Swiss-Prot record:
Organism name: Rhopalurus junceus (Caribbean blue scorpion)
Leader sequence segment: none
Family of this protein: Belongs to the long (4 C-C) scorpion toxin superfamily. Sodium channel inhibitor family. Beta subfamily.
Assigned GO CC terms: extracellular region
Subcellular location: Secreted
Lineage, opening ranks: Eukaryota, Metazoa, Ecdysozoa, Arthropoda, Chelicerata
Protein role: Beta toxins bind voltage-independently at site-4 of sodium channels (Nav) and shift the voltage of activation toward more negative potentials thereby affecting sodium channel activation and promoting spontaneous and repetitive firing.
Domain notes: Has the structural arrangement of an alpha-helix connected to antiparallel beta-sheets by disulfide bonds (CS-alpha/beta).
UniProt protein name: Putative beta-neurotoxin RjAa32
CDD domains: neurotoxins_LC_scorpion
Length: 83
């Protein structure tokens, strides 16, 4: 599946409209991935693939998002007003 990559602070990686930045961030965390800036969420969003053991082809995997909204709300507000 797809998901949001987390930064060192445990929050989603923030962005405004920079797909290339998000692609680099996603590929740094998961080698075989792609990424873009999800505008409405102001966060990078990744599509991650891994080889399936049966066919040796790439298949999507899930990214867990266990961070609460309140934990990162201040971080999101700072990003919105810093750009």
């Amino acid at each position: 599946k797809e998901g949001y990559p987390m930064g060192r602070d445990g929050c989603k990686i923030s962005c405004v409209i920079n797909n290339n930045f998000c692609k680099v961030e996603c590929q740094a965390k998961w080698r075989q991935s792609d990424g873009y800036c999800y505008f409405w969420g102001l966060s990078c969003y990744c599509t991650i693939y891994q080889k399936t053991p049966r066919f040796g082809i790439l298949a999507p995997i899930n990214v867990e998002d266990n961070v609460t909204v309140t934990q990162c709300l201040g971080h999101l507000i700072n990003v919105m007003y810093s750009h």
